[in-house]
Amino acid sequence: GLALGTTADDAQGEPNGILEGIPAQTLVRKHIPGFTLDEMRAALADDSARYASCGITTAQGGPAFSPMDAELGHKVTELVLDCAHDGTLTIRTVLFIRANDMSRLAPYPNHVPGTDLSGNGRVTMGAAKLWADGDPRGHTGYFLEPYPFVDPAKGADYRGEFLYTVDELVEKILPIHKAGWQIAIHANGDGGIEIVTQAYERLQQLHPRPNARHLVIHCQYPSYSQLQRLKAAGAYPCFFISPLYHWGEIHAGYVGADRVARFCPCHDADELGLPYNLHTDAPITPVDPLIQVCTAVTRTSRKGTVYGPDQAVTAMSALRAVTIHAAFLNFEEHVKGSLTPGKYADMVLLAENPLTVAPEHIKDIAVLRTYVGGDVVYSRS
């Protein structure tokens, strides 16, 4: 597969200082001093408080708790578990582990998704995380058709970049699948999503595993047929919809307004009976689930442009995506996601009802209190 990382060149072929993708950025990152564990502990405390103030009771760690340095990744995981016991971590966290290969996963024998790693329900095991393509805003999201407006240096047929062919991806993730891990793969463009979809289909052909619940992370530009095939393979989309609100016009300029009309097609998923979640990919976009809910309902950017109104969903559908469906995708629907006897008393008190306010006002609703396990972890002064 292509190495998803280059140094950008100007018209004369000279480097212009832009580093595209993780491998290229690593050239600089390895010279930047890392954070100490004490600094990470302080950051966990700050972030936990910030998430709670937005009404979030469970956050996913993404690969943040498993950096490229495997040894450091394990130390950070131990720090998170320690913070779950000393009160530093006030909300619940699901750990996603960077899965460059099986050796990165070896330190995590309790890898069944949803496993309580901390013993108090604060930290649970999530998925093994990989990447298939880049980001459309950086012209690295991989599409089946060329970008309509792109740097001439990349050529008229440029479709973005991918990390693996289907065969390469299957070879990498089949052992992970056989070992019982949940797998989560970053894919934005319909080309990247196609590679991941074919790989998930192949996994189930080679080693059938009911209820694997593999994920496509971000899944910004899937076709209807790709969503159908994901459902048939027992896989699910995790829609990164907030860029439609923050940068809808930028996406339209990069990939075309017709494509953006199908950005994170929640209505299609609802029509197919395919559960999905909504996420912020923080710090890429601000931590605020109500912006995600509002965007799924209105399909409107902050500048007021509406993209793909036929993909709008009801407020109830969007709320399910950040509650019970999010819990389901984490294998935690038995303890989270709804106010049901026997589940954790994790809940949020809002100043207004998102089901009855004007749809465009949902994003402005204030969070009054956030509860985790029945305890108040945030209260608006």
Question: Language model features by range: what are they?
Answer:
Residues R380-S381:
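Basic/polar N-terminal segments that are highly enriched at the extreme N-terminus
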Residues G1-H111, G126, L130, D135-G192, ...:
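Divalent metal-binding segments
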Residues A42, L174-A184, G191-H214, H218-C219, ...:
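His/Asp/Glu-enriched, well-ordered alpha-helical/loop segment
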Residues N120-T140, A235-L244:
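Non-cysteine beta-strand/loop elements that form the S-adenosyl-L-methionine
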